[in-house]
Structure formats: C-alpha cells, structure tokens
C-alpha cells in the first residue's frame, strides 16, 4: 500500500499534525500530571535561555547559581540545586529563582522551592517542604511529608495529605481536600467539592459547600451538613446535627441523637427517632414515622403508612391514613382510629374512641370505655371457636355456647319435669305431677310437698304423723319391715298381728304354746339358744335334733351300756368305758369297749393323707380306698380266688410275684418249680437311650425281624468287617484319634508327639463354624494379623496418648466429654456438618449453629422490631391467659372489660361460640320463669332470686328450699319419711348422721295377717309386755320397748333365757363348742364340728374381737368384712368384697394392658413408667434396655429459660428451617473435605482462600455495611468493600479489589473546563451530575496493576479500552488545522482501530492502521491497513483500498490464484476497488504504464488491439493456407484410401492400430486414429482429436488438449502468434485481474504486475464523476478539509466524551449502588435496603426492596437508582433456588 502520510502528536503546538509516514510518534500522554510535566519541561527547555541538557555521567552542568554537587541540575536565572545533607542528592531546579534544596528534590517553575527530600514543586512560587511531597500549581504549598498539593494556593500540612484545587487545604494527617477552597482539617478527614469542609477526624464532606463537622461524620451532597460525631447526611441541603444521626435525601433533617431521616424533606428531630418517606416527621424520642406524610409526634409513637398519624405516647398507627391519638393506643388498618387512651382499633375504618376500648374488625366501633367491640350498631359479628371459660364466683371469663347449653341442660335435667333446652339456649317449662296437683315451677311444687310430708318434730326429736287438725294419723301402706337385732325398719300392723297370733304367750304360770284350737303347737324359727351352763335361752328343734341325733348315735355306739342310761350318774361314771382311751401298754388310743376288744370310732373327720400325716382316717376315706381296690380287682383277675382270703392271697403273693433276686441283682420270673416263666400283658416299654422299661414280645419280635434283616445284610459284610477289623486295628496308629485327656483329636503319630495334617480342605470361616482350617487360611489370617499388628504397633503410641486427646465417654454424665487436661471444657473443631433431621443424633458444628444463630439473630431483629407493636397489641387484644387457660378480656388497669357487638353464638353441646348478653338474658329469663317463687331478671341482666316458703320460713334459692325440705324432708326430705331405694323401704333415718329416729303420733295400725299399717309404740308395748309375761323369769318391758332378761333357776343353776334353761335340762354336751385336743396339729383347739357327722358349722353372734398385735380374740364376719372392704377400697381397680368375704381381683389398666394384682401392676408400671435415673441425673426413657419414644408430649415452651420437653412436631418445624438453612449452607459451603480444602483453600462454593503457610488473620469488615473478602482483608468504613489478600478499603463506599490494593481516596465532586495556558494544559471534568462514591482501587501507592481484557465501552459511563482511547486521540486533534475542513451536522467519525484515521461524518475505522475518508465510510475491523475513500466506501479486506462513492473491496489479498492467461500461480497483497459488483467506474487520465505492474491506459490497449488485429489477419491468411492444405490433404486422403492404418507413404507415416479417422463434415479433414472432423471445413489433427466447429482446426478434444509448439512469430494480421509475442504484447499493457476460476475479474486491476513494489499513476486528472479516480491534489485538499472538520468535531467530541464519561461513570456508580444493596435471605422475610456507589467522580444512591417466599425457593428484587448525572434507572428480577 502507498502510505504517504500519518498523523502524529506535536507537543510543541499541542495538536495532531500530518507528517511523513516515516516520522516517529509517541502519541499523546493521557495522564494529567504527566501532560503538565511534559508541557512545563518542554516550555523550559525551549525557552529563550536556550539551555540544553546533555547526558553527562561526570560533572554536573551549571546554567544557574548553586553550590557544587553530584548529579544536580539547575537551569534558569537564580536557580539553585543544592543538597544540604548529601552532595550526591541529584536535586533539580528549573526556572527563575527555582530552589531545590532537598535531597533528590525538584523545583520547576519561577520561584519554586523544594526543601523536602525527594520533594517536587511545580508552578510559580510552588513550595514542597515535606519529604517526598509534591506541590503542583501557582503558590501551592506541600508542607507535610509525602503530601501533595495540586492547584493554585493549594496547601497540605499533614502527613500523606492531599489537596487538589484552588485554595484547597489538607491540614491534618492523611487528609484529602479536593476542590476549590475545599478544606480537610483533622486526621484522615476528606473534603471533596468546591468549598467542602471536613473539620473533624475521619470526617468526610462530599459535594459543593458540604460540611462534615463531627468525628466520623459524612456529608454527601451539595450543602449537606453532618456536624456531630458519627452523623451522616446524604443529599442536597441534607442535615444531621446530632451524634449518630442519619439524614438521607434532599433537604432531609436528622436533628436528634441516633435519629434517622430518609426521604425528601423528611425530619427526625427526636432522640433515636426515625422518619422514612417524603415529608415524614418523627419529632419525639424513639418515634418512628414511615410513609409519605406520616407523622409520629409523641414519645415512642409509631406511624406506619401514607399520611398515618401517631400523636399519643407509645401509640402505634399502622395503615394508610390511620391515626392513634390516645396514649398506648393502637390503630391497625387503613383509616383506622384509636383516640382513647389504651384503646385498640384493628381493621379498615375501625374506631376505638373511648379509653381502654378495643374495636376489632372493619368498621367496628366502641362507644363505651373498657369494652371490646367486634362490630357496630348496624353490623354484628360472632366470636367463634372460643374455649370454655372458667365458671366460679371470681371468674370473669367469657362463656361460650356449649357452656351455656351445658348449664341450661344441667338445669333442665336437675329441674326434671320434662324440662329441655331450646335452640336459643333457654329452658322449656317444667311440669311436676304431684299427688296434690301439677306444678310448673319448683316453688309451687315444694309448697305442695311441704303440706303433705311426714315432718320432723324437733321437740319430740322424731317424725310426726300429725296432719292438719289431727294430732295423730295413720301411716298406711307400710311394707313389712325387716325384723332383726339391728333393724330400724317400721313394722306394719300385719306384722304385729301375726306376732300376736303366733306369739308364745304367758298363761300365768308359763309361756303357752297353745295356738288356735290346738292345745299344743310348735314354736318355730327359734334362734338357736346359747348352750352354756348358765344359758336360759330356748333351744330350737335343730338344736334338739342335733342333741337327739347325737343321743341316737351314742345309743348305738354304747348299746352294751343301755342299762346304764337310766341312771345318769352311772352313765357318767361309766363314761370312761365309752371313751377312746390311751393304752399305755399298746402306746396308742384303744377302741376297745366293754367286753369287745374292738369297736367302731364314728364321726371321725377325714384325716390328712400325707406322708407325714398321723390323722385317723374315717370310713369314707377307707371306702374310697376300697372302691379303688375294687376297681383294681378286675386288673388282677388271676387272683380272684385269693380275694376271699386276703391273708392267703398275701401269703401266696410271693410265689406269684415278680420278685427281686438279690443274687442276680434283678427281678426274677421264676415261679414254682419252673426256673423260668412268662410275664404276660406287659405294656410296650419306651425304647429310648435312657429307658429301663420292660419290653414285650411284640417289641422284641419287631427287633428280631429287624435283626434278621440286618443279619442278612451283615452276613455279606462279615468278611469285609473281618478284614476291616485288621485294617482298623492298624488304622489306630495312623488315624486322627480322640484324646480323652486333651478332650480333642490328637495328631500325634508314632513317637512324634506332633505331626502335620495335610490335604485339609479350607474350612468354613463363620461364627458357628467348627471346621478345621488349613495352612493357607491361617496364612491369610497371619498375614492380616501381621498387617494389623504393624498397624496396631504404629497406632499404639497414638492410642496410648489418645486417651488424653480423645472425646471419651463420661459414664457419670452419660455422654461424651470434651474435657481436656485441666480444662473442664474445650472446643471440638473440624466437626463435619451433622444431619439435621427429626431422628438425627449427629453433632452439629459451629457453622451450622452460626447459621442457626444468624437466622435466630435475623429473626430476633425482626422480632425486636415487632416487639413494641406486639406488646402494644397484646395490651389491647383479646389474649390468651396461660394461668387461667383462657382468653382474657382484661385491659389496661381494668381486670375486666366488656366485649361488645358480639353476634349470638351457637348453643349446642359442642358449641365453642361466645355468648352475648341477649342470649344469656333469654336463658336467665326462661330459667327464672321455671324457678318460680317470684324470680325475675332486670333489663340490666341482674337476677332477683325466688322466695320459697317452706314450713313457715322463707328461702331465697332452690338449694335452701330443698335443704329446708331436706331438713323437713330431712325437714321435709330431711324431716320427711322418705323412700330408701337401696333398702326398698321407707327410711326413718334423720339428721346429719342418718341415725334412726322415732316416728310419733302414729295411730294404731290394724293388726291382722294382711295388715301393712305401721304399729305404734303402745301396740308394740302390749306385745312386748305379753311376751315378757310369757317368758317369766322376772322379764319386764323396758321404756325402750325391750324386754329385760328373765332368770331361770334350774338344777342349782341360774339361766337367763329359755335356751339356757333347756340346755341345762339337756344332759349331753353334743351342742357345746368343745375342745378338740387333736386339732391344730395336736396342739388342740375348740371345734365347731356339729351333728352326727361333725360337720363344720357357723358360730354366730360373735362380738367384735379386739384387733391388736397381741389380741387373740375371735373375729366376727363384720370385722373381717370391714378389713376386706378397707383392703378392697385401698386396692381400687374396682375390687369389691364378695358375699363370701373374698375380694374380687382388681383391674389396673396400664399402657392399655389390664393387670389383676398390685404386684403385676407395679411391675408393669415400673417397666413402663418414665422413671428417674439417679446415675444419669435425668428421666430415663429406655424400655427393655432399648431407647424408646415418649409420645403425646405437649408442645413445650420455647424460650431462653424454658426447661420443657419439646415434641417431634416442634423439632420437625425447626428441622425444616434448619434443613432449608442446611441446604442453603451446603449450597454455599460446597465441598468441605480436608483434601478439597487443602487443594483449593477454605471457603464456600465459588469463594475460596488458600491460607496455607500464613498466620491466621481473618478478614475484617468493621464499617457499617462493609464487606471484606480475603486473607487479612480490611473494610473499615461504611459500605466499603475489600476483596483480596491484605486489601484495605478505608474510605466510605470505597472498593479495594485485588491483593494489597488500598482504597483510601475520596473522589472530587465539582466542575472544571479544559484549558491551555502558559502553565500547561488543564483537563476539565464535571462530577456534579451524579453522586460520588468511594474510589475503586486495584493497587496502591507504588503498586499498580493493569485492567486487561476490558471490552470496548459503548455507553457514556462505560470504561474505555486503550485501543478506544488511542483511536479517539489519534483520530482527532484538539485545535483546528489549516487547510483541513469539514461541514456536516451528522454524527461524528470514529477511529477505533490502532493507528487508524477516520475523517468525515459517520465514518468509522475499526481496522488497525486503517484510513476512512468521506461520508459514512467504513473500514472493517478485519481490514487492517485498509483504506476507504469516498461516501459509503467500504474497505472489507486487509491491505485493500475502496475508492469512490459506494466502492467496496470484494476479495482482498489472494495467494496462488490462477491469473488470466498466466500459467504460474499468482499472489496479491490486496485489492484496489473503484466500484462494486453492481456499480463500476472508469479510471481516466491514466498515464501509459511502463513497468510490469503499471496500469495501462486505453491508448496502450489500442496499440495492443492493432497488433491483435494484425495477428488476426495473419491467422486468417493462415486459415486460407490451411484450407488449401485441406484440399490437398483431401486429395491425398482419397489417394491413399486403400492404405491400411499401419501403412505409410514416403512422407506420411502412421503407427497405430486404433480406430479409423472420421471426416464427417463437408470439406473436413480428420488425421489420426479415432480423430473426428464433424464440422464443415474443419480439421482434426492427431489421435482422438475432435473438430466440431466449422472452419476450425483441432489438435485435441474437449478432454484431451495438445500444444502447438515451435510456432514462428506471426507477421501478418492473420498469422498465428506465439507465446513470446503475446507476452511482449501483455508486458506493456494493464490487465484486469482474474477470478479464482480463471475468468476475468473486471472489477479489479493490479498495478505493477503484482510485485511487492508500488506503481504510480501519473497525470491523473481530477476526478469529476463519482467513479472517477482522484489525483493527489484532490486527496490533499480532502485531507485538509477533513482535518479542519475533524478538529472542529474533536472539540465537540471532547465535550461529548467528557459528558459521556460522566454519564458512564454515573451509570457505573448506579450499577455499583444497586449491586451493593443487601437482600432478604431467610424464607418469608422481606427487606428494604439502601446503597450508594461512586465511580470516576460520579456517585449514585440506590433503594431496593426484596423478599423471599415462605418456602425459601423464590427470591424477588425491585431496585432503583439515581445518580449525580440526574439519570434514573430501575431493575426487577426474580429467581428460584434449589
């Protein structure tokens, strides 16, 4: 390519200049300080002083004044470069009176002064006094070490301080002042912006006239003010004037300590108050106003919602337009109102206007204090699902429908009389049908009962039968009462009559048993009288019968003594003869009697039949034995003949018995003279190893049969056995034999005590295997043992020491203990995350607990935020009272309060609805109507009690009335004679002890067999008197009706009853309770045996015996019953005392199993109870040695102090959250294996840090909202970010990215125009159009890094690449250039490619070193070195040129392509296009080319054409000659037609055996085998040649061509030309290029023959048409015009770039601010967040709202941002996580 010029930067003129292509260029420097320094240095060097600085290595060059030193330079009048401390300091002074006194210092400029070591002073009167300080600007001063002062009168006094801007001041250490008159006074304070002021330590003022007057304060925005410690003001005119106050937004004010105002014109003036929202206001301590126009004006007040108002202390207004005006009030809902103190309004439009009132529900209102309303006068609501309230005299609980129903139902049931409960809860009318009438209420019924009952007479102390005017009255229809010693039943007349008719009456001398017409009669039902020596009781027939029976029995037994019966004395004297007496001689009792040596002993009780028993046996026992003997008789039929004589049988038994033969030591079957005999009828004996049974013949027969069978089988084996015996005998020596001593098989052999056992098959290796194992198995085991031994040996020391370092089981604690050494507690680290499931027993690690704690902390924060609201809500809500187990309507200081507007609840047995007053009134009204007695209910619900008159006394309630009747029924149901349903009779029990009582005024009842009348005392007295008279013995009737004991004197004895008297008469002792010396094991006892058979009998009337440890009294049945009853009651479990005194088994149900005794129940309880384990110090839930569940556990309280057990559902709920958190943790944590951590570093998914070999230094994010990621990363300021090892972000919102990066600079906010002056070039900026955040630093002072692989920026605030910057700078100049102009209003040109040039509107050059000139010209990125000149020209290929409107390159450089008429492959370096495929243009005024690669003009081509014409004529002539030749050849052909193909003539030879030639066309010639001349006048020469066109000669075919060689150069126009002629012709011509297929490419012409050199086209006329070539003059003029236009556009572009840069920076700041917004992360949580960002001098503020779905899967985010450029942006996103 012919590159004739290039554009380079001229530092002298400060502009880009067109220069020769060989000129060298450094390009324009981009840095400000470098640009300024370059300008200053260049200005100094080019001054009129004419000084020069050569490169000396020896003595310095002195062009000014100063003392000598090594390496110093002083240039300028009065300049001094003097090092006081070191003569080799190499200081430099340039300029008038410039002084560089510091070591290695530089003073450049008039009267500059640099006294600090390595200091630099640039500018008139600039002073750099501190070491390594820099002062840049007229009169700038850098006093502090390492400080920098940039700008006119800029000044730095502090260490490493920085002041940039006119009159800026950085006074304190590490301070930054950036902006005109910006001032930063205290340590690390920052002032950015014109007149910005940061006067306290760590303060930051960002923005014009911003002020940060408090320590750690931040003022961000124009005229923002943060005057107190820790205060923050963000926004124009924002103000935070108290400690820790925060004001964010335009004109916001945070005036109170710890207050916060966020939103336009919001104000938080109270301490710790918060105002969020446009014009929101929080004016008192702890007040919170959130929402547009919200106001919280009292202490602790909260207003949440647009235009909400909280004007009462501790009040909360929540909802749009809500208002809480009362103290401690709560308004919850849109337009809700809570104006009463302690009032609550919940719901849209709800209003609680009165004190301590509660309005719940939309539109609910209260009109009275201390009430709860769930509706209003027009709208009522039910309270449903309400638990039953407590019912007591102190209860204030609300009662639900089911309770009211239960009460009504119980009243109806107690009232009886058909009363029921109506659907409205009232009790229906009662109806009592009494004898005196039907009554419809209790009072009337009681009155009716009172007049007709048997009343108690207190005076008489008895029931009185008087009624009306009659003093005495009968009691009729009295059932027969029980007559017994303890009976207190009334007896009726018939009983008394029967008694009189059947009584044993006294006839004057004795009781007469005469009855009716019978002179004598029986006395029946006589209780057995006492039979004692002094008894006078009458004896009954049974007693006498017993006596008589005994007498009869005795008579039989002592028949021999009947003669002695007549004389009792003789009988007594002869008693010894009839007694069973001891016979000393015989040593036994003797039954001899009289002359009989033997006699019977009768009535003998059955004796014990045991081995040790000495009891006599009676006949029945012997009878049983005899019966058994008789039964056995049939079994010994062979001895029947011997039965008649037992003695003989017994004597002969020895001969017939199977007797033991001592000699033989066995039973012998010998019998008589036979030595042997059969034993028949032998039962088959057991055939077992241990059986000793005899076997019978059948068994032996079976055995013999088997033996016979075996004998046959054995016979065949006998020989073998014989042989085997020998073998076995010999085998003993070679066998593995059992060693009894060793108890094992022995491998001993011969004289060897041990020997091998070979060929042993591998035995089974199982727990129960007894197989022998072989050597290979043992080898494997030994190898394993050896391996294990080695491992164990290696582990021994570790194991020995492991005890101290292991997590061991602590038996006492029942758990693993982490105690270590002397420390009772220690950490357990590297614990893998445990499973968090309901049944998990895994240990959890700190991260899991940390996550849980973080979640808890988050929840705690959320809960804390709600605590006050909930607390207030609890005060005003209908809340659950745990102690009472119910909802409580207590409110404020009132223990009780109303619940109003309550809809009527459902009344049923299972209703839990609350009941309102009208329902209770209805029930009470119905109840009072049924109570009667004047009971009533007032309109206020007050019940007036009934009045019942009972017995002349008034009673005001049913209970007292019933009690009165009960005192008269027992006082009339207490004094009434009532029916005892249990006893089935009327009971006269009375009083609190139910003692029997007297019934007085009883008229004489009828006495007859059918009478059921009650008998009065006089009637009974008459009977008793009669009986007493009949008894005699001085018996009389006592005052209580009893009869005194009679006295009978009989046989010298005194008896007090008839029985005793009769007993005295009785001469026998058979009925007495006698001593039995044989009883009680021979120790003797009284025997109650009675009667002939001496059967056991009852002893009645036994008095209660003493019950004590020493008592030996007899105990009666009642005592035993009482004891058993007590035991049964104590046992419980439905145990009862049976009629026989036994106790039924109790039933205890434990764990759904019944147990019938205490022991089993206790065992079951002990096995199934949750018992205390002393060792574990806890309840042990193990069962059968295994851990077991505890079910049905109520949910325990969850609090920090709770010790309640928690149930599975609670833990499951926690586990679900933990699981969700665990999943989130696992997703974050990633691979936590040690190997992975060692290889990849510790961290979480996608975030890793490898701290191997580094001391532990955690990241620190101490700033509010700060983030630090990386080893020892530090983010110490608010919202700062530090990422990378040792990275530090120490400025608010600053970003330090990369290891060792430091972000400590606050970006300047302000404006400045770009200017060029004698002091140099000042690059302008405008940072006021957006919020400025902290700088992004990717390095540190002296430590830099590149940002590589940055994509080209496309938006205003995008980062730009070096390529873009170079192209932008290289494409334009900052000042106009002469002879270069452009006139257009279209978009500017853009030179993107490196070293590229773009001239013209809309022209874009993307290719490196490309040139684009013209309107909308394009050079593609791939078209390196491409040139497009002309409107819409396109250079699409590298090293190619498109020239002219619409011209395009279409192929570019080609390699090895086939050129037209060229045999050798050709190469090209590019393409020159002056048109396009559908639009070509001429190249005119082309000079005649001379070189091989020159273009040729039409004139040259005409010469060639003339030559071609001449050649054509020569060819025509040749054709004529050929035609003539054809004729001759034809003649020859005809002449030689008969010549064979292989024949020849003298001058014509062929050598072929192919096909014949074929001349088909007229006058055609075909010569050669297979040649064809098909067309007229055609010639085909050569084998296979084809001539198929007229007038042509073919030397080949379409598929087989031939050259015609040795062609002489043609002369005539029709002569053939040879290649050399054609080359000569083409050498001087310009040809079109050829396409890849060899065709001519009329769109391309290659000059210079395609060689690497270039060709000039001279004398080119100025192009006129769009497709004409342009000459150099035209191009030069175009370039000049383009340059002029470009310079103009460059100025405009510079401004646009500046603005674009600002907008891009603002956009980046917005993106960073939105990126920095935190988001909610716990399920169901929401978050409102604020963030800030700054980039390249621009800043932004972002607000966001985020929420997480309840299941934690979905996350939604909405965020918006505004920046200092006044632009707004928003983003919306949603995501799902798994």
Swiss-Prot record:
One of its GO terms (biological process) is protein transport. The chain crosses the membrane at residues 1724-1734, 1738-1748, 1757-1763, 1767-1778. This is Autotransporter adhesin UpaG. It comes from Escherichia coli O6:H1 (strain CFT073 / ATCC 700928 / UPEC). The keyword Transmembrane helix does not apply. Homotrimer. Gene3D superfamilies: 1.20.5.170, 1.20.5.2280, 2.60.40.4050, 4.10.80.270, 6.10.250.2040, GSPII I/J protein-like, Serralysin-like metalloprotease, C-terminal. The gene is upaG. The keyword Protein transport applies. Induction: Expression is negatively regulated by H-NS. Mediates aggregation, biofilm formation and adhesion to a range of extracellular matrix (ECM) proteins, such as fibronectin, fibrinogen, laminin and collagen types I, II, III, and V. Mediates adhesion to human T24 bladder epithelial cells.
């Amino acid at each position: 390519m012919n590159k004739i010029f290039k554009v380079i930067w001229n530092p002298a003129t400060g502009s880009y200049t067109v220069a020769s292509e060989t000129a060298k260029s450094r390009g324009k420097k981009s840095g400000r300080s470098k640009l300024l320094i370059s300008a200053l240095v260049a200005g100094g060097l080019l001054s009129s002083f004419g000084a020069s600085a050569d490169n000396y290595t020896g003595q310095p060059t002195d062009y000014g004044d100063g003392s000598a030193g090594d390496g110093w330079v002083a240039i300028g009048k009065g300049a001094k470069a003097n090092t006081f401390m070191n003569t080799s300091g190499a200081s430099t002074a340039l300029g008038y009176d410039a002084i560089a006194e510091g070591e290695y210092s530089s003073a450049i400029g008039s009267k500059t002064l640099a006294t600090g070591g390595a200091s630099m002073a640039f500018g008139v009167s600039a002073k750099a006094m501190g070491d390594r300080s820099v002062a840049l600007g007229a009169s700038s001063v850098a006093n502090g070490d390492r400080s920098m002062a940039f700008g006119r009168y800029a000044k730095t006094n502090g260490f490493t301080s920085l002041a940039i801007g006119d009159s800026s001041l950085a006074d304190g250490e590490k301070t930054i002042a950036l902006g005109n008159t910006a001032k930063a006074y205290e340590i690390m304070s920052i002032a950015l912006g014109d007149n910005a002021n940061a006067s306290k330590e760590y303060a930051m003022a960002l923005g014009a006239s911003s002020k940060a007057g408090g320590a750690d304060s931040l003022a961000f925005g124009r005229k923002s003010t943060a005057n107190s410690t820790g205060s923050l003001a963000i926004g124009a005119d924002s103000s935070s004037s108290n400690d820790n106050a925060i004001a964010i937004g335009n004109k916001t004010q945070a005036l109170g300590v710890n207050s916060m105002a966020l939103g336009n014109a919001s104000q938080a003036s109270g301490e710790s108050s918060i105002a969020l929202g446009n014009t929101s206001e929080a004016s008192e301590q702890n007040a919170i106003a959130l929402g547009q126009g919200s106001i919280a004006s009292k202490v602790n007040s909260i207003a949440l919602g647009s235009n909400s108002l909280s004007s009462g202390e501790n009040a909360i207004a929540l909802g749009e337009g809500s208002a809480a005006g009362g103290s401690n009030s709560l308004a919850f809902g849109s337009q809700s109102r809570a104006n009463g103190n302690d009032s609550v309004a919940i719901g849209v439009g709800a209003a609680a206007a009165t004190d301590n009132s509660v309005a719940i529900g939309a539109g609910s209102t209260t009109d009275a204090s201390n009430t709860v309303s769930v509706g209003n006068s027009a709208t009522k609501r039910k309270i449903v699902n309400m638990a039953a309230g407590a019912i007591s005299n102190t209860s204030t609980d609300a009662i639900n429908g089911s309770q009211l129903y239960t009460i009504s139902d119980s009243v109806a049931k107690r009232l009886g009389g058909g009363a029921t409960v109506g659907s409205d809860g009232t009790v229906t009318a009662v109806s009592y049908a009494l004898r005196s009438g039907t009554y419809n209420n209790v009072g009337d019924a009681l009155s009716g009962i009172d007049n007709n009952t048997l009343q108690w007479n207190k005076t008489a102390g008895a029931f009185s039968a008087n009624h009306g005017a009659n003093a005495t009255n009968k009691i009729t229809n009295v059932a027969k009462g029980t007559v017994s010693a303890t009976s207190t039943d009334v007896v009726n007349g018939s009983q008394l009559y029967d008694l009189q008719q059947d009584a044993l009456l006294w006839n004057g001398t004795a009781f007469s048993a005469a009855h009716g017409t019978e002179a004598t009669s029986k006395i029946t039902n006589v209780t057995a009288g006492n039979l004692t020596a002094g008894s006078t009781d009458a004896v009954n027939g049974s007693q006498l019968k017993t006596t008589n029976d005994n007498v009869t029995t005795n008579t039989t037994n002592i028949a021999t003594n009947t003669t002695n019966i007549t004389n009792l004395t003789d009988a007594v004297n002869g008693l010894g003869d009839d007694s069973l007496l001891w016979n000393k001689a015989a040593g036994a009792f003797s039954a001899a009697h009289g002359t009989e040596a033997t006699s019977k002993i009768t009535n003998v009780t059955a004796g014990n039949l045991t081995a040790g028993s000495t009891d006599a046996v009676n006949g029945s026992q012997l009878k049983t034995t005899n019966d058994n003997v008789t039964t056995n008789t049939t079994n010994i039929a062979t001895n029947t003949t011997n039965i008649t004589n037992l003695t003989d049988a017994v004597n002969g038994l020895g001969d017939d018995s199977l007797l033991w033969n001592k000699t033989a030591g066995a039973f012998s079957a010998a019998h008589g003279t036979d030595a042997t005999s059969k034993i028949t009828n032998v039962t088959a004996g057991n055939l077992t190893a241990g059986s000793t049974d005899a076997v019978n013949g059948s068994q032996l027969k079976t055995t013999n049969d088997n033996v016979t069978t075996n004998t046959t089988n054995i016979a065949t084996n006998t020989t073998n056995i014989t042989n085997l015996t020998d073998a076995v005998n010999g085998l003993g020596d070679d066998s593995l034999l059992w060693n009894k001593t060793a108890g094992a098989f022995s491998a001993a052999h011969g004289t060897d005590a041990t020997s091998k056992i070979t060929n042993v098959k591998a035995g089974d290796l199982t727990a129960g295997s007894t197989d022998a194992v072989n050597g290979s198995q043992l080898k494997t085991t030994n190898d394993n043992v050896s391996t294990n031994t080695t491992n164990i040996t290696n582990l021994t020391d570790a194991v020995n020491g492991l005890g101290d370092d292991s997590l061991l089981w602590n038996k006492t604690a029942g758990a693993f203990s982490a105690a270590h050494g002397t420390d009772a507690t220690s950490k357990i680290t590297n614990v893998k995350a445990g499973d968090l499931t309901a049944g998990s027993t895994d240990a959890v690690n700190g991260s899991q607990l940390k996550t849980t704690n973080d979640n808890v902390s988050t929840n705690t924060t959320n809960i804390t935020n709600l605590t006050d609201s909930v607390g207030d809500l609890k005060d005003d809500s209908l809340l659950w009272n745990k102690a009472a187990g119910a909802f409580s309507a207590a409110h404020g200081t009132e223990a009780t309060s109303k619940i109003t507007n309550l809809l009527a609840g459902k009344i049923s047995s299972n209703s839990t609805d609350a009941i309102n007053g009208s329902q209770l009134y209805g029930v009470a009204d119905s109840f009072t109507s049924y109570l009667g007695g004047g009971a009533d209910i007032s309109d206020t619900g007050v019940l007036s009690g009934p009045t019942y008159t009972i017995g002349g006394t008034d009673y005001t309630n049913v209970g007292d009335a019933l009690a009165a009747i009960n005192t008269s029924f027992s006082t009339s149901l207490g004094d009434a004679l009532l029916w005892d349903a249990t006893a089935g009779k009327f009971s006269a029990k009375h009083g609190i002890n139910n003692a029997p009582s007297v019934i007085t005024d009883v008229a004489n009842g009828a006495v007859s067999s059918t009478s059921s009348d009650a008998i009065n005392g006089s009637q009974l007295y008459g009977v008793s008197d009669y009986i007493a008279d009949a008894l005699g013995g001085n018996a009389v009737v006592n005052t209580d009706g009893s009869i005194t004991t009679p006295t009978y004197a009989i046989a010298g004895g005194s008896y007090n009853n008839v029985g005793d008297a009769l007993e005295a008469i009785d001469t026998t002792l058979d009925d007495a309770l006698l001593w039995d010396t044989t009883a009680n094991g021979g120790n003797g006892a009284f025997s109650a045996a009675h009667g002939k058979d001496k059967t056991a009998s009852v002893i009645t009337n036994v008095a209660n015996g003493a019950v004590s440890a020493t008592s030996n009294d007899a105990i009666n049945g009642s005592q035993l019953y009482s004891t058993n009853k007590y035991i049964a009651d104590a046992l419980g479990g439905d145990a009862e005392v049976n009629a026989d005194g036994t106790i039924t088994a109790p039933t205890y149900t434990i764990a759904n199993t019944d147990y019938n005794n205490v022991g089993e129940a206790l065992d079951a309880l002990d096995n199934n109870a949750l018992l205390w384990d002393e060792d574990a110090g806890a309840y042990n839930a193990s069962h059968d040695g295994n851990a077991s569940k505890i079910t049905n556990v109520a949910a325990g309280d969850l609090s920090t102090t709770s010790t309640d057990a928690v149930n599975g559902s609670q833990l499951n709920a926690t586990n679900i959250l933990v699981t969700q958190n665990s999943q989130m943790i696992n997703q974050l944590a990633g691979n936590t294996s040690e190997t992975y951590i060692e290889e990849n570093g510790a961290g979480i998914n996608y975030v890793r840090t490898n701290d191997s070999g580094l001391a532990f230094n955690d990241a620190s994010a101490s700033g509010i909202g700060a983030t630090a990621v990386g080893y020892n990363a530090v983010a110490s300021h608010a919202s700062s970010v530090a990422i990378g090892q040792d990275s530090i972000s120490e400025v608010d919102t600053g970003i330090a990215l990369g290891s060792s990066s430091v972000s400590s600079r606050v970006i300047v906010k302000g404006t400045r125009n770009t200017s060029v002056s004698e002091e140099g070039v000042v690059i302008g900026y405008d940072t006021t159009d957006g919020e400025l955040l902290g700088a992004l630093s990717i390095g540190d002072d002296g430590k830099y890094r590149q940002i590589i692989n940055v994509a080209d920026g496309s938006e205003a605030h995008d980062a730009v690449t070096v390529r873009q910057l170079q192209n932008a700078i290289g494409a334009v100049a900052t000042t106009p250039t002469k002879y270069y102009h452009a006139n257009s209003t279209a978009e500017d040109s853009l030179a993107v490619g490196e070293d590229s040039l773009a001239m013209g509107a809309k022209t874009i050059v993307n290719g490196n070193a490309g040139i684009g000139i013209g309107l909308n010209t394009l050079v593609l990125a791939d078209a390196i070195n491409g040139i497009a000149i002309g409107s819409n020209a396109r250079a699409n290929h590298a090293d190619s040129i498109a020239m002219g409107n619409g011209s395009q390159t279409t192929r570019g450089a080609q390699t090895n392509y086939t050129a037209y008429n060229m045999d050798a492959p050709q190469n090209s370096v590019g393409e020159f296009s002056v048109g396009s495929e559908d639009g070509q243009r001429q190249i005119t005024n082309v000079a005649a080319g001379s070189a091989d690669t020159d273009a040729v003009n039409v004139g040259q081509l005409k010469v060639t054409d003339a030559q071609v014409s001449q050649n054509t004529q020569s060819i025509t002539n040749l054709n004529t000659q050929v035609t003539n030749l054809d004729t001759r050849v034809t003649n020859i052909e005809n002449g030689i037609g008969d010549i064979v193909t292989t024949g020849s003539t003298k001058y014509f030879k062929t050598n072929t055996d192919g096909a014949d030639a074929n001349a088909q066309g007229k006058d055609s010639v075909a010569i050669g085998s297979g040649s064809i001349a098909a067309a007229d006048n055609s010639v085909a020469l050569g084998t296979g040649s084809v001539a198929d066109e007229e007038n042509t000669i073919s030397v080949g075919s379409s598929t087989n061509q031939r050259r015609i060689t040795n062609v002489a150069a043609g002369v005539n126009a029709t002569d053939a030309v040879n290649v050399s002629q054609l080359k000569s012709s083409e050498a001087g011509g310009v040809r079109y290029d050829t396409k890849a297929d060899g065709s001519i490419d009329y769109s391309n012409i290659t000059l210079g023959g395609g060689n690497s050199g270039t060709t000039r086209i001279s004398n080119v006329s100025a192009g006129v048409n769009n497709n004409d070539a342009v000459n150099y003059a035209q191009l030069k003029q175009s370039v000049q015009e383009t340059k002029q236009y470009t310079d103009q556009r460059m100025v405009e572009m510079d401004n646009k770039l500046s603005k674009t840069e600002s907008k891009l920076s603002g956009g980046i700041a917005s993106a960073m601010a939105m990126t920095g917004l935190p988001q909610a992360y716990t399920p169901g949580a929401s978050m409102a967040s604020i963030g800030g960002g700054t980039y390249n001098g621009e800043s932004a503020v972002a607000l966001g709202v985020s929420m997480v779905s309840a299941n934690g899967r979905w996350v939604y985010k909405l965020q918006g941002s505004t920046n200092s450029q006044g632009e707004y942006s928003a983003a919306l996103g949603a995501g799902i996580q798994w």
